[in-house]
Amino acid sequence: MKSKPDWLKVKMPTGSAFYEMRNLMKLHKLNTVCEEAACPNIGECWNKKHATVMILGSTCTRACAFCNVASGIPDKLDPHEPQSLAKAVSSLKLQHVVITSVDRDDLEDGGAGHFVECIEEIRKRDSNVTIEILTPDFLNKHDAIDKIAKAFPDVYNHNVETVPRLYAKIRPKARYFHSLYLLKTIKQKNPRIFTKSGIMVGLGELKEEIYQVMDDLRSADVDFIVIGQYLQPTSKHAVVDRYVTPEEFDHYKYVAYSKGFLMVASGPLVRSSYHAEEDFQRLKKNRAAMYT
């Protein structure tokens, strides 16, 4: 594994708020993608009491080459998880919550109904909490999109992850154009939902391919693009082709804004839910500015 440049080095997580978050997640038996995916920003986010909760168990039915989440035979659904999540959100007095999940190809609706239950339970306790969901692709789950659109999350996020040329190597069980279809259809069914998608760089993609992904996402009416450095979790995962410089990330940000995105987050350590609450407020302001 290649040694990381200085701009990718982060401090070990510490602090009372960090341990409070960890203990609360354990108390409510909740998984977080922060831990399962070994996110480099966990210390910063948890000290701000920001966390991305991972529902539908901790075992994924796929084994993407970039992802550190365990794969195999998935857990049984916890019918109490939506209520446990709502209690945790209330205990932490969160104003914005991000919910993601493993892929659940074994479930008839891919877990879409469980997402809906989580949204409903949180809003029962506090209708002012804003909710962002980061979902799998619900491939061949025909009712999933309708369920999600009707539930009306404030932000709908689904990551395309990489350029289409690399899908066979990096995301072999997914389909690039299905992901675009999913994002576009959610927006068509409920135009008030903000849509968001992310891509990793440093996997061997070309700049021109990144620009094409930007164009494809804008054609799907995606509001917000996230661009971050791929980091190899273990020796068994896809190898980092190169470390993209901060200056290159700034260039991608400039290009993305020029293509019409309402929001762009681009940087070496940027991840899908990094600064999610602050970015949601900026999204609202940027949309409002379009109509003034």
Swiss-Prot record:
Keyword set, alphabetical order: 4Fe-4S, Cytoplasm, Iron, Iron-sulfur, Metal-binding, S-adenosyl-L-methionine, Transferase
GO molecular function, one term: lipoate synthase activity
E.C. code: 2.8.1.8
Binding positions for [4Fe-4S] cluster 1 per the UniProt entry: C34, C39, C45, S273
Top-level taxonomic group: Bacteria
Pathway membership: Protein modification; protein lipoylation via endogenous pathway; protein N(6)-(lipoyl)lysine from octanoyl-[acyl-carrier-protein]: step 2/2
One GO term describing the cellular component: cytoplasm
Domain Radical SAM core, residue spans: 46-262
Gene3D superfamilies: Aldolase class I (3.20.20.70)
Compartment(s) where it occurs, according to its Swiss-Prot or TrEMBL record: Cytoplasm
Pfam families the record matches: LIAS_N, Radical_SAM
Cofactor: record remark: Binds 2 [4Fe-4S] clusters per subunit. One cluster is coordinated with 3 cysteines and an exchangeable S-adenosyl-L-methionine.
Cross-referenced InterPro entries: Aldolase_TIM, Elp3/MiaA/NifB-like_rSAM, LIAS_N, Lipoyl_synth, rSAM
UniProt binding sites for [4Fe-4S] cluster 2: C60, C64, C67
SMART domains: Elp3 (SM00729)
Cofactor(s) required, per the database record: [4Fe-4S] cluster
Catalyses which reaction(s): [[Fe-S] cluster scaffold protein carrying a second [4Fe-4S](2+) cluster] + N(6)-octanoyl-L-lysyl-[protein] + 2 oxidized [2Fe-2S]-[ferredoxin] + 2 S-adenosyl-L-methionine + 4 H(+) = [[Fe-S] cluster scaffold protein] + N(6)-[(R)-dihydrolipoyl]-L-lysyl-[protein] + 4 Fe(3+) + 2 hydrogen sulfide + 2 5'-deoxyadenosine + 2 L-methionine + 2 reduced [2Fe-2S]-[ferredoxin]
PANTHER family, alphabetized: LIPOYL SYNTHASE, LIPOYL SYNTHASE, MITOCHONDRIAL
Annotated family: Belongs to the radical SAM superfamily. Lipoyl synthase family.
Protein's name according to its UniProt entry: Lipoyl synthase
Gene coding for it: lipA
